[in-house]
Amino acid sequence: RATPRARPPRRMSVSARLLSPAALPRVTPAPRRGGRSDPPRARRRVSASTTGDDAAYDRARLEADASAMRAQRERMTDALERRNADVDDAARDDPHGEWKWAIRKRIWDRMEDTNVAQFPRPVHHRIPNFVNADKAAANLTALQCFKDAECVKVNPDTPQKAVRRAVLEAGKTLMTPQPRLRTGFFSVLSEELVPAIAADAAVLKKCCTSAGVASHGVPLSLNEMRARRCDLLVIGSCAVDVKSGARLGKGEGFAELEYAIMRMMGTIDDSTLVVTTVHDTQLLDGGEIDTRRLLRHDVPVDLIVTPTRTIWIDKAAQPAKPEGIYWDILSPQKLAQVKVLRDLRAEVEAELGETLPTGPDETLPPLAVRAEKKKMREASRGGGR
């Protein structure tokens, strides 16, 4: 194992002052063991799987996913119809990046048509799973940047399942968000926190799933998140440009939110490597994504790993990474949907003594409606059948 690295001092620009709660009182980090700050073990793991009914948890999660996908499908259809209208696309105002939908659809269609897509299918409106995703994961784990990392944040999507397993098998700490930040914040797992990971293959396999994270993972509070350092970020993508590292997700913006929150908390900084594992079919020719059309919160990657290639992005061609949460473009609907954003906003406003700006309204997939919250609560009690 690599020697734990000292946490570098954070450089705070004037503009980032409003984006980050760096001036808020810092909690005293918990005693470090093995270079990590561990949350209290006695803390209850609140999840839909605390009763052990993983099937109920998965049913509730999949129902919420299906609802979100239906809304995203309608959003894509509307965006493509507007693009096909007799309007000069180059001159048209596109504040929400609707041009991205044409690229997403092309990649999703190609993966299905060539049978590169893997379960769950169809891959439309998902971070698409692909043939040989495990080989892409193996190529990543062979790199020095992975070997040196002690804590690795990995998205909860299916194509990165092998990466999550590799993190745990290597004795590292896995940090992963709740899907869509819908039921919580970030959780961590490791052999130290869950000794059965090293002794029981079934537990290891389960901990690589969303239900396993919910039942075995230790949720982090905001203060515990501030006390941690993440060494490597692995995110899923729909498509990625091999020249600039510009990437497209499935269109909900949660990878960008997760990155912004981690930057704001000081868990990562601009130098933290961002990696995506994708199939070669998902690669876009250099320059196919016009970086001038990217939005402020879009997160580029530093490294692309496929089953056959490892592509390092030239910093000179890479767009800037977000510095934190841009409150002025964050809609009231997104704030209402994600509790951790409301908590962070309240902290910053209390520190500054002023109200932060809010972005324009938007229509979101129905992830936070009361009916689905009720289903998740029923699942946590073993019901919801």
How would you name each of these model-derived features?
Residues 50-123, 139-142, 170-173, 184-385:
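Surface-exposed, charge/polar-rich loops and edge strands
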Residues 128-147, 159-162:
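A short, well-structured juxtamembrane/interface segment
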Residues 33-36, 40-44, 370-378:
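Arg/Lys-rich low-complexity patches in intrinsically disordered regions that function as generic
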Residues 146-155, 231-234:
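Short hydrophobic beta-strand segments
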Residues 1-32:
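N-terminal chloroplast transit peptides
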Residues 152-180, 185, 194-195:
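Extended, H/D-rich, highly charged conserved domains that either
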Residues 1, 178-182, 309:
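Short, acidic/turn-prone active-site loops that include or flank metal/cofactor-
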Residues 12-16, 40-55:
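N-terminal mitochondrial targeting presequences
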